[in-house]
């Protein structure tokens, strides 16, 4: 368990599958890319089988708090962000696949007092700059942690660019 490993925090994920399936039918209506890992005939059914309900997230947060471990969650869409923000975690993570969702930043800026951890995988340099500029203009910059990441699992060593961390420090 996280407690036995002396973890300070755990991070879960929350998606609103129906929203993402409507936005990305080419992904969600097809079979899981690794059929032996699939929990359903389509990626949508696979994700639905794995997704925790908001009640389960509430229970996970309470369990974490019982053991002095910080609960957090990656939110993949606005509805998921709203649901998780209402649990009041110290921070919410925005995954690479959702880091350009400005409506999510807008809602969180007005309704969530915690910090934002934002993965910058899958972004161009211009998109990265636009995200930073937008967050600064919204007055959120003091609450932001940027993650240098490469969206690949596993990542080939040739694609790892750790020098980019210094670049992010320049913001």
Question: Where are each of the predicted segments found?
Answer:
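Catalytic cores and adjacent flexible loops of soluble metabolic enzymes
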Residues: 1-171
């Amino acid at each position: 368990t996280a407690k036995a490993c002396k973890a300070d925090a755990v991070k879960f994920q929350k998606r609103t599958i129906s929203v993402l399936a409507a936005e990305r039918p080419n992904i969600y209506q097809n079979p899981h890319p690794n059929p032996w890992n699939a929990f359903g005939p389509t990626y949508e059914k696979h994700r639905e089988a794995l997704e925790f309900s908001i009640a389960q997230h509430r229970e996970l947060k309470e369990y974490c708090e019982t053991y002095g471990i910080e609960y957090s969650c990656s939110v993949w869409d606005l509805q998921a962000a709203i649901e998780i923000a209402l649990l009041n975690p110290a921070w919410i993570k925005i995954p690479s696949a959702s880091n350009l969702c400005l409506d999510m930043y807008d809602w969180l800026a007005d309704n969530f007092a915690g910090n934002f951890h934002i993965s910058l995988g899958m972004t161009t340099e211009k998109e990265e700059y636009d995200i930073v500029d937008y967050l600064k203009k919204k007055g959120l910059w003091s609450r932001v942690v940027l993650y240098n990441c490469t969206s690949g699992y596993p990542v080939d060593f040739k694609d790892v660019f750790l020098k980019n961390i210094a670049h992010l420090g320049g913001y």
